[in-house]
Amino acid sequence: MDQNLFLTKFQFTPQRLMWVGLFMVYLLGLFSPLIENDSAQFAVMAMRMAQENDYLHLIKGFEPYLDKPHMHFWLSALSFELFGFHHWAYRLPSLLMLIVATVSIYRWSNLFYNTQISQWVAFLFASAQTIILSGIDVRTDAVLVGFVSLALYQFSSFIETEKKSALILGSVAAAFAFSTKGQIALLVIGIAILVHLSLRKKWKLLVSHHFLLALFVFSLCISPMLYAYYIQFDQHPELIIRGQGERTGLKFIFWEQSMERLSGEGLGKNSSNYFFFVHSFLWEFLPWTVLFIGGLILTIKRNQQKLSVMEVFPYLVLLIVFPLISMAQFKLPHYLNVLMPLFALATAKFIAYCFHLKKTPKSVKLIQLLILLLYFTLGMFLFFGIFEERVNSFLFVLLLAVSIWSLRAVIHLKFHSFERLLMFNAIGLIFINLILNTSFYPKLAEFQAGYTTAKELKASPYAKSPIYKLTAKHSWALDFYHQRSLKLLKAADLDLFEGLLYVSQEEFDAIKASGKTYDLISKKTQFSVSRLNLKFLNPKTREQVTSYRYLLQLTPSETR
């Protein structure tokens, strides 16, 4: 089938319906309870900013926080100021930045490819599993990828057209990306700029007045973040951060942040495996992983032929950046999110190639259909096989019926077979992620004792009462949903304490053994749901890995 015919047809309802379905995934994800640790932790940090009207200091629990810069927390705190302390308000800035990212990636791709290919680039990015996850398990990555994508588009636009407005907007976006997560943003943006300049042979732009303009705008836009760091850390060398004193915020953001991750000092080493991001990518870019690999193989095979200079652009950037971040001794899967725009751009070329073929390559067709089957099998398992009490049963039946109807409708479309295959996978990923966001994640939240305790307190006389704890161990979910951070009670003051005390199973056993009287306000099941394992997923063995958290009302010993 002629590619132009496909591209014309792709303007019709099927594409629009895929975007609507994908948007529903993100929209419904706004209303799922926050997950500990990072997502709930960052929400509490932003909540403190808004409650205390203190936007200069980053505080994690009872200690100053020197890790991620301020931008994500500022945006979330502003959302709280506007809409109140709700989990959807915390996620809203990240969702908006993912929309910015998607639009920017579309326009960025449109500088080099036609409109239809660019639409696929944007959809591949927005539907990658790790990007969808970043919209519900909100850390700093959604805001980061939004600003990075905007910077990539604007700087590429400047290199292609030399419009000053694009240079200024790119510099602002790069500054905000740097203010969100530090040097990783500049690494990706900087390498992309250098590769683009090299391919277009426009090195003269680096030694022109444009460079000074970009540097000025960038410096101006990072100054609020630098000022906040200076006030909190440079003026207080007595602060002890990760066992070290005399820490300077300015030195940290310009040097130590990346060095700590590369060396594993401070944050610790969690992976020396240089292939960590390779196997992480295999699931993070689902369901399009095979398409990227196909594009990579295609590019290598065509190495001896004449290639468009921008065809190799995303691969060259990835070839430089990917090994650099793989050398870090501290790695987490979501660190790859910032590269997803490049993965999507690289994959779209393979999609265009497949539409030139009369038939879809058998290996690609087989693997993509297996992924589709996996999505529906996993969706059924998540709904029926994990939790005995099922939520949103009607929604599940409706979703399954609509998905089956959509698959049947796609089968009868007179489109290229590869086009139908892509639509199959789009339906599958929307199906599984709607189940995750409307059923699985909300049910997981019921195993966060802090969340369920706070829900119960809202309808009790203790709704606005302060709560104490005996250790600095995190209680982010309770902090956020009670809208008050728990206070620390010294063990020596326990006998004279009067009020609410939130304790672990071990602490409860000790209080009970001491003979101290108490009123049990609540007893809730606790599990670290961000670290799922087979014993938890199996209802028969779940109790082996769960514990309890207790909320007690204590009175002073002398008054009894």
Where are these regions (language model features)?
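Membrane-interface alpha helices of multi-pass inner-membrane proteins
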Residues: 133, 166-181, 322-326
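Membrane-embedded architecture of ER/inner-membrane glycosylation machinery
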Residues: 168, 262, 298-560
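Transmembrane-lumen/periplasm boundary regions of multi-pass, lipid-linked membrane glycan transferases
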Residues: 185-334, 339-342, 348-350, 363-370, ...
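Membrane-interface transmembrane helices that cradle and orient dolichyl/undecaprenyl
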Residues: 9, 111, 115, 151-169, ...
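Short acidic/glycine- and proline-prone juxtamembrane loop motifs at membrane-interface regions
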Residues: 130-143
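Transmembrane-helix signature of polytopic, membrane-embedded enzymes
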Residues: 11-20, 105-127
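Transmembrane-helix motifs of polytopic, lipid-linked glycan transferases
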Residues: 92-112, 150
